[in-house]
Amino acid sequence: MPDSIKKNWFLLGLVAVVLFTLTDTRGILTGPGLWLKAHHGPDFVIILIFFLSGLVLDTSRIRAGASDYRGTLAALSLIFLIAPLLTLPFTLLDLSTGVLLGLFLVAVMPTTLSSGVVMTGGAGGNMAHALLITIVANSLAVFTIPFTLGILLSLTGDNRIIEIEQLPIMLKIATLVLLPLLAGMIVRRTSTALRPFLPYTGILNQIGILAMVWMALCRGREAIVSDLGTVLPILGVTFSFHLALVLAGMVIAHYGAIGKGRRESVIIMGGQKTLVLSVILQVSLFPEYGVALVVCVLHHIVHLIMDAFLTRHLKGKK
């Protein structure tokens, strides 16, 4: 297998899942996907993903990055404040409610659980600090997402958008994300039985994300197929949004005197957004807006490609 395929199999898998599911007119793929979705398949996959993520997180390394208070605050500001604010200009464009909703879901997400840490290391940054940002951001997301998303939804001007109930969302995120993540971290520290499987957790996680996207696409296939003309505008929106977020991170790092070795974790972790949690909320709260799922998936593909170039740029920058 060529090295390029080995390195990019997840991105290729995302593209394949989207194409095969949307072109499945006989129900060969969508039938099983709909059955699994109706029988708590997504919940099981989500719990497994975050449990495995907890197994991988080496909490003993967090102390090494805990002293960088300025960098941590800068990254969290990018994740929870600046990212939602950067969606405001897009509300002035002639975008459909589904596209705006997808962008809002992306913007309120915490940082990724794995790729951001790896890319920070590849850029010459502090991986321990990136890990700290990951854990803090995903813990805070339980409380920030319901409030921020509720505010952004009020900007759509579409009365069909339901008002979300904040407490149920908090409980859902805590149950499906935070508790499995903590359980995995505890098992890692207290047991050695699963350590032989640690090298494979990243692959299993990515397979789980592909399964989540597949089940969600099965549910929203009809709505997506009927609105395929929005794909190019979505690519433009997701590219512009992530570019703006990365540039904001660079500006904050520059004026905050966060130099080389520290700025990488701020810029990369502040700009990356987890896919799986956005899929959870789209499937749970807005299944009728299938195009919102397309925004989440395309943003993930676009921002990983952009960040691969960003990693090289930051590594060579003094």
What are these regions (language model features)?
Residues 1-318:
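Alpha-helical transmembrane segments of multi-pass small-molecule/ion transporters
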